[in-house]
Amino acid sequence: MLIGCFACQENQQDPQDTTQQQEQTQEPTDEVDRSQPQTGPFENTTNLTFEKQTVTEKEMIISEEHEYDAGNPDPVFAIGEGKAKGGLVTLNADTVANFNIGVKFNDTVTAKYEFKLTSSEPEPEANYDSAYIGLRLSGTGTAPNHESSRVWFLMKDQKIGLRTGKWPGCTMVPCPVDFSQGVRLIIEDDPVANVISIFYLDGDVKTPLAKLVILEDKLEFYMEGSQTPDITEPLEEPVEKTGYARIWTHHMRKVLKINDIKVSGETTASTTDPVDMLNSRDVFADTWVATDDVGRTTPVGNDTAAPGDKKVGIFYFMWHNASEQGQYNLYDHTAAYLSGGVDAVWDLIPQGNLGFAHYWAEPYFGYYNSDDEWVIRKHGYMLAEAGIDFIYVDATNGIIYERNLETLLRVWSEMRTEGYAVPQICFHCGNTESLAAASLTFLWNNYYSTGKYQDMWFMWEGKPLIFFPDSLKRTLPDEMKTFFTSRQSWAFTSDSWYTTKDGKGRWAWADMYPQSPGLSPSGEVEQMIVMCGFWANGSGGTNGGRSYTHKNGIPDYEGDWDFGYALMNTTSGLGLAFQEHFDYAKEVDPPLIMITGWNEWWAGRWGGGSGNLAQGQTICNEYRVDEKNPKYQWYYVDSFNTEYSRDIEPMTGGFNDNYFYQMVQNIRQYKGSRVQEAASEQWAIDIEGDLGQWYIVGPEYRDYQGDTVDRDHFSYVGNFRYTNTSGRNDFVTCKVSSDAENLYFYAECAKDITAPEGTNWMNLFIDADCNAQTGWYGYDYLINRSQADGKVSVEKFIGNDTWELETVGEAAYNLRGNVLQIKIARSVMNLGDTFDFKWADNSVSDGDVMQFLDLGDAAPNDRFNYRYTTEQTEIKLPDALTDDMIVLKAGSYNAFAGGKQVRLDASSTKAVLMGRGEDFYLPLAFVEEVIGVSCQGLETFNHYGITYVMPAQAIAAAGKVVTISEDGLVVISSSAIEDADILTTLYRSLM
């Protein structure tokens, strides 16, 4: 999408007129500031007065004619089960009703809420049948009986208190005011002190009533005058500093009255303004190489097509949803089978509550909760490096896991702010109108209509993509109808949801081979589904699992079938069904592929008694559901075990991460990939000398910065506390140089590198022959397991697939701040002009290759390697590139110019495109010599010894047009580029 364009703009000053501004040069810096000058983070103060229905900001004006109901929510105030007249809001009795304040204030200035509350509930009704005032809520639809609740006060008659414990728990204490007579309240939420103070007006006197002190691990509620807390509530997780506000009632016998409502504070733009991707950093993940446990190697460069504009999405689940540690029991079919055989599986089948989670196996990251930020970050990195463009979040059951969704959006938005293009998001609201309406209503009220996280939405045809039935679309207001690109989506294209429209406007999320394509409303092929597995309850009559193919059926096996566990160690991990699906999708070659799926992991146990919905269905090709047979009355729909499941996220044990690398392989073949950049400007490095020697050396091998954060979170099931503090030295950039005698390795970390400690401190792994079948998982040498007298060890792996090493030599090293350099004589290792390498810190130490995924840091991530080569391979230029284009990318030291790829400055990889918003910065010499625009009179500054300018206005004055994409691409050409697909192709093609 085009987000900026400069064409023939009038300059504020003539860049040729040196009398208007003298050239300035700042002092050189060795620090990279990619963000450039920041604007203020906050908008103007917002004052909302419900009674007068006026506000200070135009977009928050409340219409006199507006009907305050949940079905037609206002951007600021909305009512559910109540009415408003003038400035008085009345919430209905004997129901659940609410008044929403749909504005979120920033976390540095006190927010103020003022209103008159009349709340009465005749005794002896339960305390929880009360009026609740919620603050710092994750969404405007959050309620005190939701797992994502933050802070809720209770008020009625002459009592005040807090929502405590599990719903419907609450604690109330006597107070000196009588809410049944109406009390004018002033609530001040100070996020800096982390205190919420409650006052009441005694006549015209503002009088303290109570305060809530918010600590990291608990809430402390004090009545005025109390020296110790009157109520204490422990916290599993810290309360956010800001959020939404809501007044909510639970089956009160009398109406609740709220009058003369005033709200004030400073709104934050941090989650509504798009992330500035001119601050981004490409890590060149499509040039990384890896081989999985069955010998499949990810293709690179000329083994794939040139990068294009195709898109790939994957089904993502957020239902791993406990609100506290130890809340749910663990049922794991594969763990049961491995410990007790098939009899243990039969014993487990009837256990647990109906509909509750039975895991098919343990995820590699454990039985995590979906709001575990450490896991969310790992998912973001993994999916981005795999080439996933978007996730489609499961909202098919009418349930939005509010805390989990907000955490995912916040963390991934933070990662985009850090410069990394993690996947965007759309929602699958299912094919049942009522359930889809429930999901859509929440999403619209809390996200889409507010502009919150707007840059996170995956766009199709220029609008956010969403899935819901056509019947729902017909009932929506015009604003919502025109906001989305919607498609109807469900399983099995042989069913009526697809066939009645001949597939037009229909995209399947599940189908059997050969899959039918998803079509546009006019009938063009748009999409195809790819599945890595199917269903436990029949798979469309085939009884097939991960090993099933249309061509060969279910593979032969030895021994007992055991629910398909007979294939666990043979074909379940080969991805036979996955490959057949992907091969067919690549043959059809649609613009977009959707993959089912990433992290479903469990299925509910169903059945029991008469009226069994699955009567007669076959479960895992093992038994037929029989409601009259106690053993066979239970059924599972989606997942059951290693054969009958459909997750690509790595598992613990079993086939580990095979499906992940198989997915990477196929995505690259479908979308294309760049060739590896050949080594350039190779020369001898004095590792005791100036680090500036490395600036000219290319290429940069990059890693994600920020992937060493600690983990501390409870599990979804099993009462585990997952902690991981192994992250230590965070790799950012690596380089290699060489001469006839030596190889030189450079590793730069985000902060100063720690002192040497243990055998896994700053290890360098080398695959000398680029062959995964030799050495330990392909690695032939391991450098720096020990250090002495300015030297590090050089060890060689003995044999294949073993963690046995022998010392073959030593190498010089230099540790300086955040940089480690190693100099190795070529005579020590048998290395040619092409080899693979990997850095790792505090990671693998005993031969478990999977530990690259979660221990310490590895560069590149997981099993991936960098490839060093001196072989010059022709860059695959995109067809969209024309001779008049200058194409630049945020954080890149390369550009397309004159129909080829060139450096911005031949002397340094530190010379990159930098910018913010529509302001971008380039080396002066590049602007004048390559773009052909004079920089005379422009302000200059020095970056790593390179003179920079901000050239946009000068370029426009020269008659050229600048197009800036939301990905962080800058194109200088004779005319603006409006086609988003062209911009995507150019972005993906440039290193």
Task: Walk through the language-model features, giving the residues of each.
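Secretory/extracellular carbohydrate-interaction modules
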Residues: 87-170, 756-761
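Surface-exposed, glycine/proline- and aromatic-rich loop segments on solvent-exposed faces
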Residues: 115-117, 123-145, 685-792, 843-850
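Short tryptophan-centered beta-strand motifs in secreted/extracellular beta-sheet-rich domains
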Residues: 180-200, 208-214, 221, 820-824
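Glycan-processing catalytic domains of CAZymes
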Residues: 272-686, 690, 698, 753, ...
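Extracellular glycan-recognition surfaces and repeat-rich motifs
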Residues: 49-93, 696-727
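Acidic/polar low-complexity flexible segments
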Residues: 144, 223-242, 248-253, 677-688, ...
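Primary recognition of N-terminal secretory signal peptides and signal-anchoring hydrophobic helices
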Residues: 869-991
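Short, aromatic/His-centered strand-loop micro-motif at the edge of beta-sheets
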Residues: 162-192, 204-209, 803-815
